[in-house]
């Protein structure tokens, strides 16, 4: 069929779009860059925004159609596939490039999974010295200059939900097909080495991105080191990093425990069918004419196929629920998009029981009432079930790229 051009809006129009909510009025761009939970909830609940983006595109689309899109500009930082619009019958696939549709995707191999989680960032007992070479410590040098953790300050704290997450995922796959690293064992040396051995990678830890502005293409082309610096300001934290990242003479011959997007570029991940970075901000990066310069680009340059990353600081327990259900669906035979969609639905409907208050006081008995009217017995507390994670902040942070 002939290619069809559909005009939508200018960059300024969409960036300055006013988010619909009952109290505060902010723009789309402000909501995307905001770290407030309420702003994420308003953004992804705005039905007018969803229609503005999707209605013209999907108006003449047949039912149950697969939609493939490659984002541009600010849409790299917005999960437009999760916005409210009237075509739930369509499956939407985010691609790093539409040329992926023309590539031979081969056949899926038997799952082999590398799992990392429950890492101890203060324990560097398993870190290996490299006296004959100088390890790559560029990440700690850059973060040190910027006065950022874990080089400066208190460092990163232990994630209880991360340990539960990887332990539950481990039970879903054959022990012979899974390698789990916890506590002090998930060092940068081990991760770089073993990421190149498995076709599925799941890393549950802290993530960071300190550079996710949109750069005009004219400026970006003039700066040859812009991409390299951007890739060095996005990464994940591994075992012992609170100690090994310090600018100390004792750390001269050890990896700094910070795996950046730039370092990922140098690995061979062509065999990796799915890479999951279950951490905060792993889908962010500097936006340029070439796309997003962050962890997604590092993984794609290394050759990884589908990746699952996040747009903001995620909730520990909600992420644990999401990831566990995602793998449960995936290992039952569902495709990646269906597995994530069903996992998000599971999180949205996840219920907990909460106490609503103490019931009215009741007399123990009529006889007792006559004997001592001052003694009372409290009724059992009343409880109700609530959907704790139904807001978009809890389930819409993670998105798949190239899950085809």
Language model features: what each stretch is:
Residues 1-404:
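Catalytic cores of enzymes
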């Amino acid at each position: 069929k002939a290619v069809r051009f559909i005009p939508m809006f200018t960059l300024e129009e969409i960036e300055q779009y006013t988010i619909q909510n009952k109290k505060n009025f902010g723009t789309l761009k402000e909501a995307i860059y905001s770290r407030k939970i309420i702003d994420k909830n308003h953004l992804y609940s705005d039905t007018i925004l969803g229609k503005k983006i999707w209605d013209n595109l999907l108006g003449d689309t047949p039912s149950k159609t697969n939609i493939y899109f490659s984002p541009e500009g600010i849409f790299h930082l917005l999960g437009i596939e999760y916005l409210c619009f009237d075509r739930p019958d369509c499956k939407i696939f985010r691609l790093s490039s539409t040329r992926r549709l023309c590539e031979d995707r081969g056949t899926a191999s038997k799952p082999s999974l590398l799992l990392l989680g429950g890492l101890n960032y203060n324990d560097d007992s398993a870190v290996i010295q490299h006296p004959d070479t100088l390890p790559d410590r560029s990440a700690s040098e850059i973060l040190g200059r910027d006065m950022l953790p874990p080089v400066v300050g208190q460092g990163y704290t232990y994630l209880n939900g991360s340990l539960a997450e990887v332990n539950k995922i481990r039970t879903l796959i054959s022990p012979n097909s899974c390698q789990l690293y916890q506590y002090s064992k998930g060092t940068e040396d081990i991760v770089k080495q073993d990421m190149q051995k498995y076709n599925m990678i799941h890393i549950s830890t802290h993530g960071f991105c300190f550079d996710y502005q949109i750069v005009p293409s004219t400026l970006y082309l003039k700066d040859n080191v812009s991409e390299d610096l951007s890739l060095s300001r996005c990464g994940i934290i591994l075992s012992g990093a609170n100690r090994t990242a310090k600018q100390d003479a004792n750390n001269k011959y050890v990896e700094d425990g910070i795996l950046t997007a730039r370092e990922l570029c140098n690995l061979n991940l062509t065999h990796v069918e799915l890479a999951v970075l279950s951490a905060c901000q792993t889908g962010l990066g500097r936006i340029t004419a070439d796309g997003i310069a962050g962890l997604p680009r590092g993984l794609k340059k290394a050759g990884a196929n589908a990746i699952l990353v996040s747009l903001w600081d995620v909730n520990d327990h909600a992420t644990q629920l999401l990831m566990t259900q995602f793998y449960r669906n995936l290992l039952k035979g569902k495709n990646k998009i269906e597995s994530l969609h069903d996992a998000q639905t599971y999180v949205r409907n996840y219920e907990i029981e909460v106490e609503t208050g103490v019931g009215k006081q009741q007399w123990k008995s009529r006889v007792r009432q006559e004997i001592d009217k001052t003694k009372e017995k409290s009724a059992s507390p009343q409880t109700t079930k609530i959907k704790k994670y139904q807001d978009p902040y809890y389930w819409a942070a993670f998105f798949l790229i190239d899950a085809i």
